């Protein structure tokens, strides 16, 4: 037998979830976090309706401080009716990391109600005690009074509104909260950013000046001041402010991130690199931090270092087409330095030219016959990843087009992407309400988990049905019931309220 004839093909074969779970546990023992993440993803894909692989994946994502991604996995598991009491404990850990403390308490109470003698019962009790301990929360989160908690909750919601592009709503919310807590620096700093991002720079400057004149400014206030100086082309004042910020020994991720952005925007890449390396010790799996680190290395002509950042991002999320783009750019420039781009997008998104090219590619696909579209959806991984990427764009028209296309496909993958859309705080409520109807028409199992109107909720479409149409104000009450009472608590609360409202409507005998 010759050497040639002895060569054979390596035939891949699917492994069980148990196999990948064992490999993932072994990686964790070796402290190979990204290796374990990969194994647990494979385990979850092999058995998506089993609780153990999903919870293992959610747990490691929580460890990596990717709390929202972890929560989406747990909530989708619960929506499929295969969740376990441990899901509530996992949600509590994530809500705590997301600074959603009321939801953390609610989830812990749900866990203890569903499994009072469960494996995490003692931990849940201790967790609740910590959340009720003013001194502990002051040390951990900088919160002491009820006003502090209210301000924190308002800032969390305002950031979600800003991520969704609704700056006016964020401003309105924060102005209202500032009336109740006029001395809150946290609220004023967030209001500054809401004004700035909404194009009202004069009002943003007014808030910053008020804080600085009163001596209540903090490091985030000074970051905002430097940002406003840059926006007004006052480079000398901005540089002086940034020099002052560099003397800070803060370990606050939010403050360090603000300083890093300013340094990148002013082309001070070496200084930015130092700040980002400090940040990496605190949030080593944060995509925005890794992207800025990659960009700084790229600008400093450390192309292999830049590539390592995007390779790391792709190990975290193999479907991340933004990381794929920047990895490709780094490789091209490494091979030929003359092709070095003068500027990338500091925000974690592809540049406009690349976004335009991708959207043109999607539009060409939309012109294909439906059968060809379905074929691409089924077999073209790149096409699927492009659609997922397009939903991250701020343009509402793009979102509507992609959501309509997913609705057309009506399969398990489309349903999963629609459910995922509902759970993303940065996505607009109007489109989420449309997705509720799409899922209902597709026959997707209820309840539908969502972040809607600033609340995490689980709801059922048409959970109140009548044989006759209701006037708009009465119909709106149903939506309010869903949004205001449909949180993660026991569904019986919503059912009881719905029953009361139904009896009231029926008592009117259609005389509205």
Can you say where each PLM-predicted feature lies in the sequence?
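Canonical tetratricopeptide repeat
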Residues: 22, 56, 90, 123-127, ...
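Short coil turns that delineate tetratricopeptide repeat
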Residues: 48, 82, 116, 182, ...
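TPR alpha-solenoid repeat register
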Residues: 53, 87, 121-124, 153, ...
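TPR/TPR-like (Sel1-like) alpha-helical repeat modules
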Residues: 96-133, 247-251, 281, 303-339, ...
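Amphipathic alpha-helical scaffolding segments comprising HEAT/armadillo-like alpha-solenoid repeats
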Residues: 307, 380-392, 411-423, 444-453
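Alpha-helical segment of the N-proximal tetratricopeptide repeat
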Residues: 15-46, 63, 146-180, 190, ...
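Register position in tetratricopeptide repeats
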Residues: 29, 63, 97, 127-130, ...
């Amino acid at each position: 037998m010759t050497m040639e004839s002895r060569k054979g093909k390596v035939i891949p074969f699917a492994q069980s979830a148990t196999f990948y779970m064992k490999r993932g546990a072994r990686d964790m023992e070796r402290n190979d976090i990204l290796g374990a993440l990969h194994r647990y993803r494979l385990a979850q894909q092999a058995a998506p309706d089993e609780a153990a692989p999903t919870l293992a994946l959610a747990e490691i994502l929580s460890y990596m401080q990717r709390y929202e991604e972890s929560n989406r996995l747990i909530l989708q598991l619960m929506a499929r009716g295969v969740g376990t009491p441990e899901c509530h404990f996992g949600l509590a850990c994530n809500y705590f990391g997301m600074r959603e403390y009321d939801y953390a308490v609610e989830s812990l109470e749900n866990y203890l109600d569903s499994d009072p003698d469960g494996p995490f019962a003692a931990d849940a009790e201790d967790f609740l005690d910590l959340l009720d301990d003013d001194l502990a929360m002051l040390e951990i989160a900088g919160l002491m009074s009820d006003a502090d908690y209210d301000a924190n909750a308002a800032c969390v919601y305002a950031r979600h509104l800003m991520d969704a592009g609704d700056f006016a709503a964020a401003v309105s919310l924060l102005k209202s909260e500032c009336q109740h807590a006029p001395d809150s620096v946290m609220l004023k700093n967030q209001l500054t950013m809401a004004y700035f991002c909404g194009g009202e720079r004069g009002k943003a400057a007014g808030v910053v000046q008020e804080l600085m004149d009163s001596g209540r400014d903090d490091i985030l206030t000074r970051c905002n001041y430097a940002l406003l100086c840059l926006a007004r082309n006052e480079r000398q004042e901005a540089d002086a402010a940034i020099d002052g910020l560099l003397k800070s020994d803060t370990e606050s991720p939010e403050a360090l991130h603000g300083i890093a952005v300013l340094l990148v925007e002013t082309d001070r890449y070496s200084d930015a690199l130092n700040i980002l390396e400090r940040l990496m010790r605190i949030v080593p799996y944060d995509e925005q931090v890794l992207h800025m680190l990659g960009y700084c290395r790229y600008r400093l002509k450390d192309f292999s270092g830049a590539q390592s950042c995007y390779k790391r991002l792709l190990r975290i999320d193999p479907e991340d087409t933004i990381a794929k783009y920047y990895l490709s750019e780094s490789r091209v420039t490494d091979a030929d330095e003359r092709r070095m781009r003068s500027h990338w997008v500091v925000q974690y998104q592809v540049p406009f030219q690349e976004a335009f090219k991708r959207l043109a590619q999607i539009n060409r696909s939309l012109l294909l016959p439906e059968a060809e579209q379905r074929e691409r959806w089924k077999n073209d991984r790149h096409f699927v990843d492009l659609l997922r990427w397009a939903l991250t764009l701020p343009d509402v028209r793009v979102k509507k087009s992609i959501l309509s296309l997913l609705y057309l496909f009506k399969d398990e993958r489309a349903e999963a992407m629609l459910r995922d859309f509902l759970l993303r705080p940065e996505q607009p409520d109007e489109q989420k309400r449309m997705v509720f109807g799409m899922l209902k028409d597709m026959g997707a199992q209820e309840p539908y988990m969502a972040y809607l109107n600033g609340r995490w909720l689980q709801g059922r479409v048409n959970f109140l049905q009548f044989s006759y149409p209701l006037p708009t104000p009465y119909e709106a009450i149903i939506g309010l019931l869903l949004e205001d009472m449909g949180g993660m608590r026991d569904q019986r609360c919503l059912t009881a309220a719905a029953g009361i409202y139904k009896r009231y409507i029926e008592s009117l005998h259609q005389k509205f």
